[in-house]
């Protein structure tokens, strides 16, 4: 859903490279332990446990009539992520979960593996608008643990008011650490139909692209196929290509909903 940033300065990169040089010079293969890319899939049972834990003491509000029903949704997924450093790469599981939390705004968390999660806050507004005030990615890869938080204004739409094909919108968001401005450019690509469990679902196809031009440089376009009346993400496609500190991070994913009813 959003760009992950992990190289915040050159010191971490230098330490990793130095470790590789020292160990490899000994003629061993222990360097693989330093750069081993761990991938622990989050199954449905674990996703349900996370959802139930986060629902404690939360209550429904009237605004939720225009947001996805809370619960755990299952998606058919392809794709993966990689770093240019030492060929670090891993694939996402073929089945992943999105956890929709209860609240005034919905928190939608894609949890393919425990080492990589993406959370989008989705709020409903007047005239059918769906906005995205916050995007959070947590990542553990190549020995580095990071959390990337992007805050956006009310005009950062997932779906604008009276959405029609060809609509365009922009907003300026802020990356918390390092503090940098990020441009969000949105586009409505029009209505579409997606088949879910044998049922045809009418959706609106939108895209928003995050452009980074600071410590990180690159783009992060994400396509959403959304049910306008509920904000349910029926399909999502994400591409990431960003360079930071001389290291390039790449991600691609396509997730399609397999059942319209969530598990709770």
Briefly describe each language-model feature range.
Residues 2-22:
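N-terminal Sec-pathway targeting helices
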């Amino acid at each position: 859903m959003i760009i992950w940033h992990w190289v915040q300065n050159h010191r971490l990169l230098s330490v990793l490279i130095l470790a590789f040089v020292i160990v490899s010079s000994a003629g061993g293969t222990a360097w693989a332990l330093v750069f081993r890319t761990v991938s622990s899939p989050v199954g449905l049972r674990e996703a349900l446990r996370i959802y139930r834990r986060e629902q404690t003491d939360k209550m429904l509000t009237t605004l939720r009539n225009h947001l996805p029903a809370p619960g755990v949704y299952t998606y058919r997924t392809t794709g993966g992520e990689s770093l240019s450093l030492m060929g670090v790469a891993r694939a996402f599981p073929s089945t992943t979960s999105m956890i929709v939390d209860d609240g005034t705004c919905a928190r939608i968390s894609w949890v393919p593996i425990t080492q990589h999660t993406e959370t989008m806050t989705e709020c409903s507004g007047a005239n059918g608008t769906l906005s995205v005030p916050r995007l959070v990615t947590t990542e553990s890869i190549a020995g580095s643990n990071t959390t990337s938080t992007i805050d956006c204004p009310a005009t950062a739409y997932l779906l604008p008011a009276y959405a029609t094909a060809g609509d365009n919108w922009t907003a300026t968001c802020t990356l918390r650490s390092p503090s940098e401005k990020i441009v969000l450019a949105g586009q409505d690509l029009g209505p579409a139909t997606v088949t879910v469990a044998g049922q045809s679902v009418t959706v609106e196809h939108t895209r928003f692209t995050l452009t980074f031009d600071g410590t990180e440089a690159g783009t992060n376009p994400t396509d959403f196929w959304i049910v306008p009346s509920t904000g349910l993400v029926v399909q999502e496609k994400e591409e990431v290509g960003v360079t930071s500190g001389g290291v390039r991070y790449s991600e691609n994913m396509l997730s399609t909903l397999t059942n319209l009813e969530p598990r709770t």
